């Protein structure tokens, strides 16, 4: 679970909510039969034999796939019976066997970001997504004016060498998130997908 739009502003929640997942494994994964759920009573069983996500691929699960209604999001699969609270909620992806594949519990801005019209997105797919500190607010505008990167790298400018040394995540801000990503790169070898922004001293070495 890589990005969550729980509270769109350009359209109503009933048509504009979406969830982005990414396949961080090395194998194709068939999502048919998997369950989208929260800790209450909302569940949706994915029913599509062709819904296969390849290694490194992003996929958008959304409440509506009409671009003219949903804020301009290309949705890969439409779910029903599952809604995202604007305050706190859970997004849980469950294997047909009952095993939890992934889960995120966001918390009304206590540790997770929570801004109207902006998705909350994982800083790096290699980070633990159950920790709010590893998420940030989207800064890229899409569709009708909300902010997010549905179906794309959360920081699409990471591969552009723009001289912003130290801006590890390429979001044009210099803050603690850059420090967290740099330390994570050193200790856990999960580095940002960029070519130059992590080069703090401009020596072309990372």
Describe the residue ranges of each PLM region.
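Cellulosome-associated attachment modules in secreted, modular CAZymes
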Residues: 150-206
